[in-house]
């Protein structure tokens, strides 16, 4: 987690090739600014049903991970679709053993199903069409305090205000870190061929760290 937050700080305050990266990011969202390219970035147009996926190999841990990305959604204002950012599952298994990080009704939604759903929704809404958001989801099911098992950060600050907050049981195994499961970016892994629930927006600097919260 410290590595991902440090990376966020570097992206906001640091320089690459003598240029402030945050200025580059902001430049892409302003119509009056020059056009820039952001390294390690991709545009997901939901109409094209895009996604990236891979099958998980041998994990470092089946109980701990950290995921981070910059995201600039292009669909806002009570969009009722569930927009998949990152997920894992056995393809075709829609009932259990699947994990989701998504954008839904302008809030961040994080859910894990280890037999029953443990769902977290932010109270804060994200509706600025000119903004990039940096998201970190850090997981450690071995923590004795339930709220420490799933931590969410937006733009470097931990989110603690939720409209829904249910946590996985202690020591649960999670699909995102399980060998043989499918990980997907931009779509739900359990239904990877479906045209539904695709992310519509930009993602950049996507990082997944296995075995660390």
Task: Show the residue positions of the predicted features.
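Short, solvent-exposed beta-strand-to-loop segments that form ligand-recognition rims
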Residues: 154-181
């Amino acid at each position: 987690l410290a590595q991902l937050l440090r990376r966020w700080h570097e992206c906001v305050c640091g320089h690459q090739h003598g240029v402030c990266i945050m200025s580059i990011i902001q430049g892409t969202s302003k119509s009056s600014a020059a056009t820039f390219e952001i390294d390690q970035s991709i545009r997901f147009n939901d109409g094209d049903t895009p996604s990236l996926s891979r099958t998980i190999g041998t994990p470092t841990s089946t109980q701990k991970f950290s995921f981070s990305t910059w995201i600039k959604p292009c669909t806002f204002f009570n969009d009722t679709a569930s927009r998949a950012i990152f997920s894992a599952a056995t393809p075709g298994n829609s009932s259990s053993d699947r994990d989701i990080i998504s954008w839904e009704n302008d809030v961040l939604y994080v859910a894990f199903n280890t037999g029953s759903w443990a769902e977290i929704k932010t109270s804060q809404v994200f509706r600025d069409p000119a903004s990039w958001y940096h998201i970190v989801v850090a997981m450690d099911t071995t923590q004795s305090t339930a709220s420490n098992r799933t931590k969410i950060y937006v733009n470097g600050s931990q989110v603690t205000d939720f409209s829904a907050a249910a946590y996985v049981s202690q020591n649960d195994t999670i699909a995102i870190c399980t060998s043989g499961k499918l990980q997907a970016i931009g779509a739900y892994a359990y239904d990877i061929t479906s045209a539904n629930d695709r992310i519509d927006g930009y993602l950049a600097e996507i990082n997944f760290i296995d075995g660390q919260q």
